[in-house]
């Protein structure tokens, strides 16, 4: 609600995040649960440059649908979604990925909502 009050009338709210339901979200939640990236469950699946483990442990993870529901409940409307990191995490450093519309496949998602 504080963010909505801070926006001018017809303002735009932008959220960029790793969705809980994405491959990256699952990987980071597992690393948080086991306390390290250096765990047999994560061998061979980690990207070369993961987020710092401290960020994974400190993060509060939510699904994109949860975020949309909260924004709608706050009165936001006219949503746009963009995503990237569509490859499995261990392959993300091989090529630059373009941003594409949507949110169901990306490991990093932008939600754009209007007041």
Question: PLM features: residue spans?
Answer:
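Short, glycine/charged-enriched secondary-structure capping and boundary segments
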Residues: 1, 28-31, 95-96
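Core SAM-dependent methyltransferase catalytic element
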Residues: 74-77, 94-115
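Conserved class I S-adenosyl-L-methionine
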Residues: 12-43
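C-terminal and late-domain segments of enzyme folds
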Residues: 83-84, 104
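Short alpha-helix
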Residues: 58-81
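A short glycine-rich, Lys/Arg-flanked "PGG" loop and its adjoining helix->strand segment in the class I
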Residues: 1-12
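Positions that flank functional sites
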Residues: 21-22, 85-87
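Class I S-adenosyl-L-methionine
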Residues: 48-55, 86-100
């Amino acid at each position: 609600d504080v963010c909505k009050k801070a926006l001018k009338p017809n303002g735009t709210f932008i959220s960029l995040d790793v969705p809980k339901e994405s491959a990256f979200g699952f990987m980071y939640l597992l690393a948080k649960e086991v306390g390290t990236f250096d765990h047999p469950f994560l061998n061979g699946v980690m990207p070369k440059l993961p987020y710092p483990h401290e960020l994974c442990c400190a993060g509060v993870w939510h699904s994109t649908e949860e975020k949309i529901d909260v924004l709608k409940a706050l009165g936001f409307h006219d949503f746009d979604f963009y995503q990237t990191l569509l490859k499995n995490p261990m392959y993300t450093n091989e090529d630059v990925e373009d941003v594409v519309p949507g949110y169901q496949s990306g490991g990093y998602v932008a939600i754009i909502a209007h007041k």
